[in-house]
């Protein structure tokens, strides 16, 4: 699933080519994605001018001069593809929704597994939307701090990995960036969240911010379906230190015999990757 850096990259690409433009034509080819499309979606979008873009967690918000906001979610394998004026759009049988602006710019949502979402809401009611209302703070925002994390985690008797994947704790994180941040912070993914001390909370906040900023600068991580709106791949997968690297050497360790490399752990059906030397297992915290 595209995580915060990928969604931020997509949002920025859309903003670059669509901000200030007027939607001339809208087409819905399949309305049965994760949720049904609004019945009046086409009528409310056609003729509207795009006035701004935002991202909340893994959701893209497109604000319109009509007072509405168009919400897009890429789901498990969705992507946005832009065609600029004069380009020939590349047909894709999994494109379920698209719109064109008056200058010929085309924006399509391609979603093979149909776990994505498209919705329309009054802009004034964004915070109360059912998909946004319970989200935690943005990890790159001011509210996300060592004090916030310490207070929230003190009540969590789950693993720190599970806590960080909970979108009510912090918004937008997923498996890749949680694994990378925990490695940088030196925290084992199976540690109980409530056992972290203040110094570890502070390191973790810093690690999350650093990983996300670096990933955004690299255009995200291209894993299977993800590409940027212009069709280019992201590059942060080349900077992964532990994710997907089980059996390979830890970049921060001297190697055997002290460390035999990155290990994989399954947690709640998801793979976690860690270095057993840099991230001491529970019960061996130094």
From Swiss-Prot:
Keywords: DNA damage, DNA repair, DNA-binding, Glycosidase, Hydrolase, Lyase, Metal-binding, Multifunctional enzyme, Zinc, Zinc-finger. Gene3D superfamilies: 1.10.8.50, MutM-like, N-terminal. One of its GO terms (molecular function) is class I DNA-(apurinic or apyrimidinic site) endonuclease activity. Binds 1 zinc ion per subunit. The active site is at residues 2-3, 58, 270. PANTHER family: FORMAMIDOPYRIMIDINE-DNA GLYCOSYLASE. Belongs to the FPG family. NCBIfam families: fpg, PRK01103.1. Involved in base excision repair of DNA damaged by oxidation or by mutagenic agents. Acts as a DNA glycosylase that recognizes and removes damaged bases. Has a preference for oxidized purines, such as 7,8-dihydro-8-oxoguanine (8-oxoG). Has AP (apurinic/apyrimidinic) lyase activity and introduces nicks in the DNA strand. Cleaves the DNA backbone by beta-delta elimination to generate a single-strand break at the site of the removed base with both 3'- and 5'-phosphates. This is Formamidopyrimidine-DNA glycosylase. It comes from Gluconacetobacter diazotrophicus (strain ATCC 49037 / DSM 5601 / CCUG 37298 / CIP 103539 / LMG 7603 / PAl5).
């Amino acid at each position: 699933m595209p995580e915060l850096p990928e969604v931020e990259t997509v949002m920025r690409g859309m903003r670059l080519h669509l901000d200030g433009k007027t939607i001339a034509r809208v087409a819905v080819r399949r309305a049965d994605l994760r949720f049904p499309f609004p019945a009046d979606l086409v009528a409310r979008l056609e003729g509207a001018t795009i006035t701004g873009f935002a991202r909340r967690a893994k959701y893209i918000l497109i604000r319109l001069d009509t007072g509405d906001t168009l919400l897009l979610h890429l789901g498990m394998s969705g992507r946005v593809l832009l065609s600029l004026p004069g380009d020939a759009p590349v047909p894709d049988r999994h494109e379920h929704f698209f719109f064109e602006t008056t200058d010929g710019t085309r924006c399509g949502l391609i979603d093979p597994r149909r776990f994505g979402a498209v919705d329309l809401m009054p802009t004034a009611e964004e915070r109360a939307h059912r998909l946004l209302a319970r989200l935690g703070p943005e990890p790159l925002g001011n509210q996300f701090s060592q004090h916030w994390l310490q207070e929230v985690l003190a009540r969590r008797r789950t693993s720190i990995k599970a806590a960080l994947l909970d979108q009510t704790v912090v918004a937008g994180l997923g498996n890749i960036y949680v694994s990378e941040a925990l490695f940088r912070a030196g925290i084992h993914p199976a540690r109980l969240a409530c056992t972290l001390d203040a110094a570890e909370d502070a390191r973790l906040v810093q690690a999350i911010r650093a990983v996300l900023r670096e990933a955004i600068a690299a255009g995200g991580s291209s894993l299977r379906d993800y590409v940027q709106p212009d069709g280019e791949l992201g590059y942060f997968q080349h900077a992964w230190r532990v994710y997907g690297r089980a059996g390979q050497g830890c970049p921060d360790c001297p190697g055997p015999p002290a460390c035999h490399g990155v290990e994989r752990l399954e947690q709640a059906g998801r793979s976690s990757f860690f270095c057993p030397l840099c991230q001491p297992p529970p019960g061996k915290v130094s």
